Amino acid sequence: PDSTKVLFTNVTSNKDHRKQKYKDEYVINVFNDKLEKLWEKKIDFSVADKDMIISQSQISSDGDVFILVKEKSKEKRSKWCPSFDYSFLKVTSNGDIEKIKIKIENAYPKHAKLSIDQDGNCYLLGYFTEKKKRDVFRFEHGIFFHKYDSNGDLVLQKKHKWEKEFYVKLKEEYNLDKVSSGADGFYIDGISIDYLQNSISLISTHRYQTFGNSNNGGKGTTSRYNYANHIIISSFDFDGNLSWTSCLEKKSNPMSFLSNMIFGCYNDNIYLIFNALKKLG
């Protein structure tokens, strides 16, 4: 959103073998457009990387840094619910740190991504899982949309459940006897903001795993095959209202399962570029 600020982050591990303590240090450096350092901040994560994972970081036009983190939950939950919580840290140039936990009514965030607009507002979009079990194929029960102002205060929050037709479409295309539900899911590629059309889109890849058995010299082995078969695009207005959702087939094979995707928006169109490798031989 602001080309006059450059954010550089790094993680360093400080190990004290005498005290057998391990502490990760997250280093934030902010530069101007001439690559002159404006400020630096070091954050200690004493809980170690098993309990906290840094998912994403972005910088606002005011020079504040927002860090999205996943933390292992201490709450006892049902097996279909995620075992972690999402929070984001707001770090200012003065060194102040504010932690904001992502809360969804009667649900848990399962995947999340943040984006900051040109006014410093923070948008957090992702998929949620309801606390009450639902008789559906998916573990993700819908999309949530949160908006925070530049101070980190929650402005609005909305959630949208998937239509039944969407679940039916996925269920009919896959042979459930050969699909590992634990590996099946949505993985967010990113968020694209179109200021001309006042829209914000969540772009995701739907992935699933299949298994195959083979016999090698009388010894049976099981192989896994990963596929990224669909791209899901959900577009909202700036008030969090869902405008449309599109499910696009991604021609892919296991080699391109984890290939990166580049995307952008212009004049009410969304452009996607990804590596669709072809099988050789």
Indicate residue ranges for each PLM-predicted region:
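Solenoidal tandem-repeat scaffolds enriched in leucines and small polar residues
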Residues: 1-97, 115-125
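Structural signature of eukaryotic scaffold interfaces centered on beta-propeller domains
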Residues: 1-5, 55-62, 113-119, 128, ...
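Short, conserved, GDST-rich strand-edge loop motifs in beta-rich repeat architectures
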Residues: 6-24, 70-82, 127-142, 205-227, ...
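Active-site-proximal structural scaffolding
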Residues: 21-24, 50, 81-84, 107, ...
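Beta-propeller blade signature
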Residues: 23-36, 81-96, 138-154, 219-241
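Karyopherin-beta/Importin-beta family HEAT-repeat alpha-solenoid scaffold
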Residues: 40, 57, 80-89, 97-100, ...
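Surface-exposed loop and turn segments in beta-propeller and other repeat-based domains
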Residues: 42-50, 101-107, 155-183, 243-256
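Loop/turn-rich, solvent-exposed surfaces of beta-rich toroidal or solenoidal domains
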Residues: 69, 143, 188-224, 228-232, ...
